[in-house]
């Protein structure tokens, strides 16, 4: 009797672009030997919309609604970076009250982003309950956004020299109530998840990144801090009014998926601490710098020149970006979000290069999943936290 010989061929499998664990339209071409991953090739570009080229054909004010579509789960950060660049180029001072309002909005946005990372990450691993819990808290954050900005997601709230509107009456008390409630919710998550043996089995020691490796790959945000490096642009660059508030950089040294989970949970607690201090210490005064109106140009464009074709006969109020180049960055929930901006003495930027954290953090994925099991891909990709809107731009 002949024993049937088993085939030893490698198998090539497509994951995505329509896969629930891909967090958007990411496609992975996997080479498998049974359950073991031999190779992984990410295919990007399914959500490419030419955001950098669009920026060159818009004034900064016209471009503001577009930027909320990069990372559509943390839109305040994309708005912050879009107004910070022209503010630095034009030496525009932001009033203290506006700076405090910005910090409150940024940290609320960070919490909303981390919540919508936690739910799907747990669902990928096989825990369904936290997925429903996080929407309960995220809804409260969006209620606060809606009361202050009028929009739940694409806020369009930041303006050059300040913010679009002051905080409405009663909003500060409502936000303080949310902060008190949310700390108990985070404790509930930790009770539910952190010591769960099945969860620990799936994440402990999976996707380990050492500190030197993290720096060499250019990682940032929770990916970097989970590898033992205390680097946070809020402390390093001293932007807005973070220096006036008392908070700590949360970090872990293990570098695995569990460490990345713990860093994000810790960051949510620190964000609440920052928001509470900012709400209690928020000064009075204007919420925007009215001097920015002086930058409004009313000169008539020449017939058929570049600006004439885009802004039409009546120029919209904007200001010239001086002939300089500038790199601005903020600490977004996913890492360092930056733009490289070149002005050309016109209303349009000559070059607008986006440095998305998700795109750079994703580069290490093939190295992390090699020699791992197929099921670990969901864990590792989930712990990186990517949004394809900013990866593909």
Curated annotation (Swiss-Prot):
Main location: plastid
Compartment(s) where it occurs, according to its Swiss-Prot or TrEMBL record: Plastid, Chloroplast thylakoid membrane
EC numbers on record: 7.1.1.-
Any one biological process term the GO annotation gives: photosynthesis, light reaction
Annotated signal sequence range: none
PROSITE patterns assigned to the protein according to its UniProt record, in alphabetical order: COMPLEX1_49K
GO cellular component, one term: chloroplast thylakoid membrane
Pfam family, one: Complex1_49kDa
Single GO term (MF): oxidoreductase activity, acting on NAD(P)H, quinone or similar compound as acceptor
Catalytic activity from the UniProt record: a plastoquinone + NADH + (n+1) H(+)(in) = a plastoquinol + NAD(+) + n H(+)(out); a plastoquinone + NADPH + (n+1) H(+)(in) = a plastoquinol + NADP(+) + n H(+)(out)
Family per record: Belongs to the complex I 49 kDa subunit family.
Role played: NDH shuttles electrons from NAD(P)H:plastoquinone, via FMN and iron-sulfur (Fe-S) centers, to quinones in the photosynthetic chain and possibly in a chloroplast respiratory chain. The immediate electron acceptor for the enzyme in this species is believed to be plastoquinone. Couples the redox reaction to proton translocation, and thus conserves the redox energy in a proton gradient.
Record's protein name: NAD(P)H-quinone oxidoreductase subunit H, chloroplastic
Organism: Eucalyptus globulus subsp. globulus
